[in-house]
Amino acid sequence: MRELKIGMLQLHNTADIQKNIENLIEGIKDLANRGAELVVLQELHNSLYFCQVEDVDNFNLAEPIPGPSTEIYGALAKECGIVLVTSLFEKRAAGLYHNTAVVFEKDGTIAGKYRKMHIPDDPAYYEKFYFTLGDIGFKPIDTSVGRLGVLVCWDQWYPEAARLMALQGAEILIYPTAIGYESSDSEEEQQRQREAWTTVMRGHAVANGLPVVAVNRVGYEPDPSQQTNGIQFWGSSFVAGPQGELHYRACTDDEESIIVNIDLERSENVRRWWPFLRDRRIDSYGEITKRFID
């Protein structure tokens, strides 16, 4: 058995960025004190989900990497002796911004980063206004707790992203997330959306024989433009094993601080039973790079 203790923080954010960061620091320290070796945070965890509106003033939230936030979280990872997965609004240059996951090693150094590749542009999720498409590619990040396949939110709907991480030796798929209901959706529609979200990532776990970690924010955030009813983030952060089995799923309506133990060696056994990578017809997939096959 190769056990890994994974900590997750499912939090409700406010407009007070300093308070959000203080809550994160407190939560990360608590998880470390409870034995977490790897801690994963939600998408854009320092602030509200500002992409509900297109507002140039929100670019002031972005910061360089390295920068103030990486100093805070790097020092925290070192103090706690953990590997830490964060999600930041990166200012790469004037007018050039990314939605970037930064992974810190136990000594506080940056182990690697991933720039979100799939960028949505839908009502209440106007991310193309803020974020440039990622250009690092789908590259796992090597850490002392394993090779991490870190992706971000909208990436979770694309099996190609998970597969490319798996083909490069990722041992865990990790998804910092910010997703919720449009507040006027019916209860039935809310349930369908939440279950689809969980199911697609559990499918990635099965198809690739890897555990999956998804960490979502929770709580209501109003639409500053008042064009929609705002977003009710549905929480439900979870860990699934390499057969898609749920080890834990958080609640939909409250903050949670979670530790889940997983056995990284299970992937080896599962892939022996279900050798999907062996049986791939790599000679027949060339057309998958087309937008559509007419």
What does each model-identified segment do?
Residues I6, V103-A111, V239-H247:
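Short, glycine-anchored, charge-dense loop/turn motifs used at functional sites
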Residues I17, K29-K106, I110-K113, I179-L210:
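Cys-nucleophile CN-hydrolase/nitrilase-fold catalytic domain and related Cys-dependent amidase chemistry
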Residues T100, K113-R115, R249-C251, I259:
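Residue-level detector of high-confidence beta-strand sites
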Residues F138-Q168, T177, S267-D294:
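Cysteine/selenocysteine-centered motifs that mediate thiol-based redox chemistry or coordinate metal-sulfur cofactors
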Residues E3-N13, N20, T100, K113, ...:
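Active-site-proximal beta-strand elements of phosphoester/diester hydrolases
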Residues A62-V85, C153-E256:
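CN hydrolase (nitrilase-like) catalytic-core segments centered on the catalytic cysteine
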Residues T86-L88, T100-V103, K139, S237-V239, ...:
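Short beta-strand scaffold segments in enzyme catalytic cores
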Residues K116-Y130, D254-R271:
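A short, polar/charged loop-to-alpha-helix boundary motif
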